Amino acid sequence: MQELHLLWWALLLGLAQACPEPCDCGEKYGFQIADCAYRDLESVPPGFPANVTTLSLSANRLPGLPEGAFREVPLLQSLWLAHNEIRTVAAGALASLSHLKSLDLSHNLISDFAWSDLHNLSALQLLKMDSNELTFIPRDAFRSLRALRSLQLNHNRLHTLAEGTFTPLTALSHLQINENPFDCTCGIVWLKTWALTTAVSIPEQDNIACTSPHVLKGTPLSRLPPLPCSAPSVQLSYQPSQDGAELRPGFVLALHCDVDGQPAPQLHWHIQIPSGIVEITSPNVGTDGRALPGTPVASSQPRFQAFANGSLLIPDFGKLEEGTYSCLATNELGSAESSVDVALATPGEGGEDTLGRRFHGKAVEGKGCYTVDNEVQPSGPEDNVVIIYLSRAGNPEAAVAEGVPGQLPPGLLLLGQSLLLFFFLTSF
């Protein structure tokens, strides 16, 4: 039994002293160090002692870091990988290093980085990613790095940074973002304001400069002139017809999304109907209502016709098209959305009572009812439903109906005499 214990301890001692052949392992200043720098390595060698806290793989020829590359060294506190040929850091390559405090990936060729791995590195204090090929950093990349003190992103290919990127870094004291080809458009204005007001040390600010547009090339971000910028706004309204459109006979639902903002926002329709969700990210028809070249539709006339001016037409509107129609606008400064619920009810079959029960008490403060002439009629907080009767020709006649408690809500707009459409207007 005693011999068995001796063999067991000998095995443990051997494992503790194991070290990959190209590397030097030992203790220094109370840290377990594995030095594999300048070894002409093309991959991370296996066989490290599990108690290693500092690992240097600098100045090798590593082309990438695969998933689980450092699974053998879970207690690692410092990892040095500078001056390699790393292009890709795969998801899971760094995620297991929850004790890591210093990470140096500088002077590589990294363009593909698993930013989600950083979410597990909450102890990180130093992150060096300068002199790489990074073009994009997600807004939430640093969300867990509340202990980070120094961040180096200089000498990359970053064109912009999302507002709020550095907000989670409450301990940050040093930031380098110079020598990046920034696009000085509305999306970068926040960075100028933040850099001028933050207590974080940001050296070489004259080298944080614009690459585009051409008129601003070379201008330091700190001296960027005021730009005409505004976040998107949207107003979703009903229109009885679409000028110049060739519509098929029958009922027509026409919506118009009025979008404002600088730079000009991108318009996107999100339609939720019984059969699923329809996304329309660009116009799919011309003014004649026929599909534009390249539009993926089965016929020459799409079911949901999105025009370049912000209008959306649904000819022959029926039960299959009931649902929620949302207009979304997005630019560099943010997004805005407005929605309308659309359903059919047959007059004389309890449709009005159904609508009254469904929407009773759901007041939308500050909304307005749109007439056939697309003029907004002021409505009080109790005006929350617009009832629309469309004629077969698609040319409704307007009349306003007053409601009382227990019946249809007030502020209803009645159009025509055949098919009932109701809209519950909401804005986000």
From Swiss-Prot:
Expressed in various tissues including retina, heart, skeletal muscle, prostate, ovary, small intestine, thyroid, adrenal cortex, testis, stomach and spinal cord. GO terms for biological process: cell adhesion. PROSITE patterns: IG_LIKE, LRR. Keywords: Disulfide bond, Glycoprotein, Immunoglobulin domain, Leucine-rich repeat, Repeat, Secreted, Signal. The keyword Repeat applies. GO terms for cellular component: extracellular exosome; extracellular region; platelet alpha granule lumen. It comes from the Eukaryota. Residues 1-18 form the signal peptide. Disulfide bonds join C257-C327. Residues 19-50 form the LRRNT domain. SMART domains: IGc2 (SM00408), LRR_TYP (SM00369), LRRCT (SM00082). Residues 180-231 form the LRRCT domain. Glycans are attached at N51, N309. It is found in: Secreted. This is Immunoglobulin superfamily containing leucine-rich repeat protein. It comes from Homo sapiens (Human).
